[in-house]
Amino acid sequence: MIVRQLWCSRGSTSHLCAAVRLNWRSPKMTRPSSDLTAFREHFAKAKHIAIITGAGVSAESGVPTFRGPGGFWRKWQAQDLATPEAFSRDPSLVWEFYHYRREVMRSKMPNPAHLAIAECEARLGQQGRSVVIITQNIDELHHRAGSKHVYEIHGSLFKTRCMSCGEVKANHKSPICPALDGKGAPDPNTKEARIPVELLPRCERKSCNGLLRPHVVWFGETLDSDILTAVERELEKCDLCLVVGTSSIVYPAAMFAPQVASRGVPVAEFNMECTPATQRFKYHFEGPCGSTLPPALERHESEAV
């Protein structure tokens, strides 16, 4: 078992979860290699590749992370708004925040890392090999790059869930409702819109009209059990794992790759810096993912043209 051991307690499994440092006592390990040629030999032989991606991938497309210094929207940190309690207390304010994030994403494009992953997935698929993307990001940039086999473990900015009937539905409207048009500016001096709840996004199912919420994982919420089951299955069968642009300090995704490594599967980390999990991996490639990942995933000389 991989994922089920990592089922986190209530309050620690959000896509905006505060950084939780891994507290294992790592045994003495060999320093990870940065030998791209050696990695490429593993890549050429792999039949089932799992690629775990985090905020670092999207950051290279200019997507705000709302983490660390300056990670504010108006005067609030993301964790102030990304909770069921905040939505219950002030759905207008929370929807302004998510409307802003949705609109920002319309100007962002997949970067070379997204495109390299999508091209690799398509190419290896034609060879009877598989690539699966397990992403902590909620921006759908992997989909826009052309990736097909994507698990969005923290949900999507472009899906909604009805608070009444529970329907989950893709929603790419801009604005998502008329009352939010022009709202959501991030400037701290911006006046709150205070939109009446009946004018916020509503369910379109006949006879429902329930209040919609963003279909993302908030503080105090657990991840979707069906998605975790599928992720567990993918991680158990993979014979090569890449960890791309993730800090490895947020649960449960922080433990995915280390547990894959614990069964002897090569794991390669692509990140701007070392992480608490780096010493557990066979490879570490430091630098922008958009620069380090494409040459790692390009066609190998052993592949048929």
Swiss-Prot record:
GO biological process: peptidyl-lysine demalonylation; peptidyl-lysine desuccinylation; protein desuccinylation; regulation of ketone biosynthetic process
Catalytic residues (UniProt): 154
Segment annotated as transit peptide: 1-32
UniProt GO MF annotations: acyl binding; heterocyclic compound binding; histone deacetylase activity, NAD-dependent; NAD+ binding; protein-glutaryllysine deglutarylase activity; protein-malonyllysine demalonylase activity; protein-succinyllysine desuccinylase activity; zinc ion binding
Annotated Zn(2+) binding sites: 162, 165, 203, 208
Reaction catalysed by this enzyme: N(6)-malonyl-L-lysyl-[protein] + NAD(+) + H2O = 2''-O-malonyl-ADP-D-ribose + nicotinamide + L-lysyl-[protein]; N(6)-succinyl-L-lysyl-[protein] + NAD(+) + H2O = 2''-O-succinyl-ADP-D-ribose + nicotinamide + L-lysyl-[protein]; N(6)-glutaryl-L-lysyl-[protein] + NAD(+) + H2O = 2''-O-glutaryl-ADP-D-ribose + nicotinamide + L-lysyl-[protein]
Subcellular location: Mitochondrion; Cytoplasm, Cytosol; Nucleus
Primary location recorded for the protein, binned into one broad class: mitochondrion
EC number: 2.3.1.-
Cellular component terms per the entry's GO annotation: cytosol; mitochondrial matrix; mitochondrion; nucleus
Cofactor, how bound (note): Binds 1 zinc ion per subunit.
Any single Pfam family the record assigns to this protein: SIR2
Cofactors that this protein relies on: Zn(2+)
Protein family according to the UniProt entry: Belongs to the sirtuin family. Class III subfamily.
Protein known as: NAD-dependent protein deacylase sirtuin-5, mitochondrial
